[in-house]
Each structure stands twice: as C-alpha cells, then as structure tokens.
Amino acid sequence: MSETKKGAYSCSFCGKLHSEVKKLIAGPEAYICNECVELCGGILQEENLPAKQGRFDLKPREIKEVLDEYVIGQEHSKKVLSVAVYNHYKRLRNSGVISEVEISKSNVLLIGPTGSGKTLLARTLARVLQVPFAMADATTLTEAGYVGEDVENILLKLLQAANFNVEAAQRGIIYIDEVDKISRKSENASITRDVSGEGVQQALLKVIEGTVSSVPPQGGRKHPHQEFIQISTDNILFIFGGAFDGLEKIIEARNRGSSMGFEANVQSMVSPTKDVLSYAEPEDLVKFGLIPEFIGRIPVITSLGKLDENTLFRVLVEPKNSLVKQYAKLFEMDNLELKFDDDALMAIARKAVDRNTGARGLRAIMESLLLDFMFDPQGCAHEGKVSISKEMVENLVLGKNCFEDARKGNLYGRG
C-alpha cells in the first residue's frame, strides 16, 4: 500500500499524493489515481481500435496521378509500380473470397542510379495508400547469429511505424535499399559463409514470400528474454531498390551472345532512347549475384533512368514539396521573398549532373549556395527580396563568395 511517512496516501503507479489529484481509488494492496485510470483507459481503447483500412480503392491511373505530383519523370516505372500496387491490394481486399486460383504477391525491384527517385517512389506510394511504411538498408543486415541487424528488425520498424498495431503493419510497405550490395561474391556457391551477402538473401526468402515471424519489440539480441510479437508477412508489400553498378555490362554481354546469325541485326539493337537497364532479365540479376530463389520472389522488375538537366530543373520547381518551394517558405518565415532566375536553376541542375548525384545532390548544392544568405538573410536582402542569379551559382562552382557581391547589390537577378 502506498503511504508516505507523514501518513498521506499516494498513487502506486505515478506516485502523486492524494492532494495532487482529483480522485485516489483504493484497492486491497495499492492505490490508483484518476489520471492513471484515464491513461490506462486510453491505451486499452487504442489497442481495441480497428486498424486504418488505407486507400485500397484507388485505380492504377489515380495512383500514378498522385505519384506525378511528387516524382518528376520515370513515367514507365510509375506506371509499373501503380499497377503492381493496385494488384497487390486488390488481392488483399479479396483475400476472404474463396477461390481456386491463389494469387501471389507483387513484390517489386527498382533498378536505377543514385538520385533517380527509387526511395521517393516507395515513400510516396505508402503516403498515397495511407499504410505504414518502413525503410531499411540491406548493407546493415546479416544472418541471424552474427553482428549486425536481423531481418526481423525490419518488421520491428514497420510495427513501430504502425504504432504497434499488428493488423495495420501486416498491410504495410517495406522498402529495402542497396539490395545490390547483398549479392553473393561469385556466381558459384561459396564454401565459406557469406553472412552479409547470400546469407541475407536466404534469410529474406521466407519473409518476402509470406510467413509468420516472431518480432522482438525491444530490438532482439540485447533483450533475449522479452515476449515476441507474431506478425504475418503474407500481405506486406516488399519493394527493393539498388543501383546495380556493372549490370549494364552483363546485359550487353548477354545481348551480344544471343545476337548470332539471322537474328543478329534484330537482337543486337538496343534502342538508343532507352536505358540499358530497362532490358534487364532475371538471368542478368543472377549473374550479378542475386540467388535465383530470391529473384523468383520478386516478379515485378522496373528500371529508373538517369535524370538529365531538364528533368532536374523540373524536380527543383514542379513537385508539391519541391526544393525551391521549401527554401522559399523558409525565407518567407523571415518576411523575405526568395527568387531564382531560370538560368540559375538550370545551372544548379547542371552542377548536379556533373556531380553524378541525381536529384539527391540538389539539396546539397542548394545548401551550399544559400548558406550565407540564411546565416544573414537581412544583410543580403534588397527591398525584401533575395534573388539568386546564374552568376551566383557559377561563382559557387568556382569557389567564390557570391554573398558579398549580393550584399553590395552587384549580382541581383531579375526577381
């Protein structure tokens, strides 16, 4: 029984005195205050709430239209993803209907260079469908029993994203990046244990196909005696992404090998308007180092092309949450208007192409360009405006301090 030395009773859970709460309820061995009762009631109510159903009624065209608002370019990949996701959740909606035909999952593999939009596509899909989303890096995963993350830790991230609502988590999306980094070292089976390559692929097999996994709510190895949460992966959509550097050579070698005799003129022609990666076949990925069983569980494969200057220019200005809009909002909070010349934006896009970082490199360039302006926004403002010109971007490339010129009024754009 909770009683202080002075004889005042207190809550056995939070420790608050009788005088500090509205009501203190007595039990045989303990007291509980009204605040703790309300808190416990809220927790129980949350657990009993039905899981959010998500927007599973969207048609492929509607899904792509929303993707278009956030992801610029990659039209074919957006179409492929929209259809795959629609079919996956259509299968889920009709899971209770008895059918002679069992429809397998539409797990997806996105192949494309850094900064082409793989992660953004997966994240946007989850937002469109209003389902829990978790992201993992394949390079941190190892086989169970070795130093590193277990595959079950990915499911834990999804559970956390769903606020430990198991039903909601079982309809979520998991994106695993850098999957090309877990390719086995050679095409032949290795005698030595490959715990971060083929071993991880083997560990992922059952999870991505569909199984009931025991997930440690506190993260696994550090808490061996905790109770596990059972989660079915039958309806979790897995999306994998990777750059697959060197896959082009494998595709071209296959293409040359099959281009013999009568069919040579037909088969050896790779369309100059299409990226080589768009011709990837499962056999190419096996040669790259993914095991056949792993590839067999990912039926949908699509490639994302490298973004050119014009596309990167559009990435800067067109999406709902474009970088230009984000930085303009930050300056607006200081009662300033941020303006970019079109030539300045094209110069930023050109710099990202030169760095070979795709859309991901745009933010780093913008940060470098605007650092001094954000440090002293009023010092470079002219009549409440901060204007960025092409010359400023070019001076950044040359390592010059364009902020001083802007403050003197020498480099103001046409804003």
Curated annotation (Swiss-Prot):
Residue numbers binding ATP: P113, T114, G115, S116, G117, K118, T119, L120
SUPFAM superfamilies, A to Z: Glucocorticoid receptor-like (DNA-binding domain), P-loop containing nucleoside triphosphate hydrolases
Gene Ontology terms describing biological process: cell division; proteolysis involved in protein catabolic process
Binding of Zn(2+), residues: C11, C14, C33, C36
Pfam families, alphabetized: AAA_2, ClpB_D2-small, zf-C4_ClpX
Cellular component, GO, one term: HslUV protease complex
Keywords associated with the record: ATP-binding, Chaperone, Metal-binding, Nucleotide-binding, Zinc
Domain ClpX-type ZB per the UniProt entry, residue ranges: 1-52
Keyword ATP-binding among record annotations: yes
GO molecular function, one term: ATP-dependent protein folding chaperone
UniProt function note: ATP-dependent specificity component of the Clp protease. It directs the protease to specific substrates. Can perform chaperone functions in the absence of ClpP.
Quaternary structure and partners: Component of the ClpX-ClpP complex. Forms a hexameric ring that, in the presence of ATP, binds to fourteen ClpP subunits assembled into a disk-like structure with a central cavity, resembling the structure of eukaryotic proteasomes.
Family: Belongs to the ClpX chaperone family.
The protein, known as: ATP-dependent Clp protease ATP-binding subunit ClpX
Organism encoding this protein: Anaplasma phagocytophilum (strain HZ)
Gene name of the record: clpX
